[in-house]
């Protein structure tokens, strides 16, 4: 057996055995991208199930697990200190972070209240207090490092599918290189 054959065999074995651990998290948003994700899952389940382990996706299952994750998808803007702490925790447990949708990528429309007048802020203060929300809404990237962005409200399906394909290829290549260097 030639060394290149062994490397190829290892790569094939890795691709069959190792699924990417995926997390999907929602913060302040309407969760329209989560709806699009579940619709895409209907179309791509057989393919994705071979390569993705849906470790934490609350819309799909009740028993979710925390990281580590290969990829975490984060939908929604960050509106509270509790959300900021949670998104930092997710970042620490994830190789890659993908900001999903307009609220996560741009902060909007959730952050429209950042432009409110003092009178408008006074009108909504009871809601901010009730939910322990901060005065300002932040993009995910204002709180943590983001590796990929999928814009849109709801998310752009084409960019999402391209991002999934890119991440699967990149992580598998990284795994194969890691295995090869340990030979």
How would you label these PLM feature ranges?
Residues 3-183:
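Iron-sulfur-associated redox domains of electron-transfer enzymes in respiratory
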